[in-house]
């Protein structure tokens, strides 16, 4: 190699080095998706201090592990590793400012552009870990600042790669994939948030375009680049989880299955894709098929046991939908013993399943529901300084059992099922709704035969709300509307479960949407949004109200909050 060609050789070496890094990281991700988790980390670790892509992907895999284990040591380790990855990326960035400070003729090298997108991604991941790691509001705000900075870099990157002057190096598809992931993630996520929550997160003035976000993520997921997996996982989470839990409950199972198909062919035993395939079957009401896929997901790998916990959670709900209370209890018990995510929730669900059994039926392992309900508050935990809303809800409901002669919760399993929008899940299979209606009618008969007490009105309204959902599933719209209205007119009589009224208004508005009464639906949604505050699971209800208003293309601004929020 002659001295006169040193400059071109150096530039070519840098490009080859970047390409070699990307190729090796793709191989590591391939191992990861084939359940070879430790081998994936072993391939990434040696270069994680010198290659921005090795550093980023290594830290990302550790982050995924930490979010599944929920072990504080794992979260701290992942956070420190992601911080180190950000420092590695910083070394490759342009020294004098970012993209926005470029002069007209001040071109960035391919390596420097890749460093920008990797740096933005590190910020995003660190923000997520910050929210999990610390228990004070200062850390929460720091996480919000990281998110905002990441957002601004992604916006600059998106504009930059769209410009005609952009140099398209040999690894440009990976750069585009990184930008698609960031822009898609922000647009989709921000579109889900009500305006007042965006304000709390320092995102006032920012908004998300849901359809644009989905299109960006879909492009990224189908482009066979380094970020394909992340784009696909985020879309699958949206299609099979977020659209149910924080949306109006339709789900987008056809899109999920279309996205899954090539990944299922490429990774037929990939535990992650078996899990999402199971979730798709669950949404369709094909419970037996879902159970088989979740069980296959558990059998597919034994290295990351914490991945099994995601399957156990879904198996618990599958058996709930079929009213196999003891089988559902079995998975709640496994979770309570093995998972760190929310022991209070798992113990509450164990107690709830036992309470659904006839008094004459034996209890597994000699457990007693009253004792279990009383244990629930002892397992309280905090994330970002606050207890998770579902855990707070479980603890509040379990308080009833502190009394020496407690008044039983009428249908605690079905109530929690509603919080996870499970009644939408069973709507596709009439026999599942019929079974739940039988359970509710039996609970209603028991309640009417019992002496009145301080919980009677609240328990009656809960049963009315859930009956309304079953009747709606069965196409009995007027009867369903009557049930929801019964809850609404009982508002002033409620003593404890004040969440029932805004949720009854939400469900009635969704019924109105289905029956073509758009204007009435909007009025009810605005009432649910503006007239109620400080009730259980408020954020989740507000997310669902926002989703319904967005669906109707109604005004989703806060209207200066002229009524109490």
Curated annotation (Swiss-Prot):
It comes from the Eukaryota. Keywords: Repeat, TPR repeat. Transmembrane segments: none annotated. It holds the Pfam family Iml2-TPR_39. TPR repeats lie at residues 271-304, 461-494, 502-535. InterPro entries: Iml2/TPR_39, TPR-like_helical_dom_sf. Belongs to the TTC39 family. This is Tetratricopeptide repeat protein 39A.
């Amino acid at each position: 190699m002659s001295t006169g060609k040193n400059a071109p050789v150096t530039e070519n070496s840098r490009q080859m080095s970047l390409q070699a890094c990307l190729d090796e990281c793709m191989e590591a991700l391939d191992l990861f998706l084939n359940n070879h988790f430790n081998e994936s980390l072993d391939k990434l670790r040696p270069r994680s201090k010198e290659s921005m892509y090795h550093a980023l992907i290594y830290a990302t895999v550790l982050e995924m592990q930490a979010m599944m284990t929920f072990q504080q040591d794992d979260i701290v380790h992942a956070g420190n590793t992601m911080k180190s990855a950000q420092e590695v990326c910083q070394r490759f960035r342009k020294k004098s400012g970012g993209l926005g400070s470029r002069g007209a003729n001040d071109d960035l090298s391919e390596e420097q552009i890749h460093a920008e997108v990797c740096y933005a991604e590190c910020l995003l991941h660190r923000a997520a870990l910050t929210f999990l790691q610390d228990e004070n509001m200062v850390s929460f705000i720091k996480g919000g600042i990281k998110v905002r900075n990441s957002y601004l870099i992604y916006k600059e990157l998106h504009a930059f790669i769209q410009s005609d002057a952009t140099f398209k190096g040999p690894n440009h598809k990976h750069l585009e994939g990184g930008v698609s992931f960031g822009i898609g993630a922000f647009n989709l996520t921000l579109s889900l948030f009500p305006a007042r929550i965006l304000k709390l997160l320092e995102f006032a003035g920012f908004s998300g375009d849901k359809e644009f976000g989905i299109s960006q993520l879909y492009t990224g997921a189908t482009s066979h680049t380094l970020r394909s997996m992340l784009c696909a996982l985020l879309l699958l989470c949206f299609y099979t989880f977020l659209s149910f839990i924080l949306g109006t409950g339709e789900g987008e199972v056809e899109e999920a299955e279309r996205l899954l198909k090539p990944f299922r062919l490429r990774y037929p035993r990939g535990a992650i894709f078996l899990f999402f395939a199971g979730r798709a079957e669950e949404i369709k009401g094909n419970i037996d098929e879902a159970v088989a896929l979740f069980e296959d997901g558990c059998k597919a790998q034994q290295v990351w046991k914490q991945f099994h916990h995601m399957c156990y959670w879904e198996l618990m709900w599958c058996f709930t939908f079929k009213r196999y209370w003891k089988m559902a209890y079995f998975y709640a018990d496994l979770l309570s013993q093995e998972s760190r995510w929310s022991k209070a929730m798992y113990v509450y669900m164990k107690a709830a399943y036992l309470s659904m059994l006839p008094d004459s039926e034996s209890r597994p392992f000699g457990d007693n529901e009253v004792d279990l309900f009383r244990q629930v508050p002892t397992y309280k935990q905090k994330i970002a300084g606050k207890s998770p809303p579902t855990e707070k809800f479980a603890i509040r409901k379990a308080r009833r059992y502190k009394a020496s002669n407690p008044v039983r919760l009428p249908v605690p399993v079905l109530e929690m099922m509603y919080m996870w929008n499970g009644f939408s899940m069973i709507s596709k299979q009439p026999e599942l709704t019929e079974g739940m209606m039988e359970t509710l009618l039996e609970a209603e008969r028991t309640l009417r035969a019992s002496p009145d007490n301080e919980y009677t009105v609240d328990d009656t309204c809960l049963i009315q709300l859930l009956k309304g959902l079953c009747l709606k599933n069965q196409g009995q719209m007027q009867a369903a509307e009557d049930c929801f209205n019964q809850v609404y007119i009982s508002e002033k009589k409620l003593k404890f479960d004040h969440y029932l009224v805004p949720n009854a208004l939400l469900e009635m508005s969704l019924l109105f949407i289905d029956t073509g009464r758009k204007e009435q639906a909007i009025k009810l949604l605005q009432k649910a949004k503006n007239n109620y505050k400080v009730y259980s699971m408020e954020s989740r209800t507000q997310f669902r109200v926002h989703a319904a208003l967005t669906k109707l293309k109604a005004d989703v601004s806060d209207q200066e909050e002229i009524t109490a929020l």
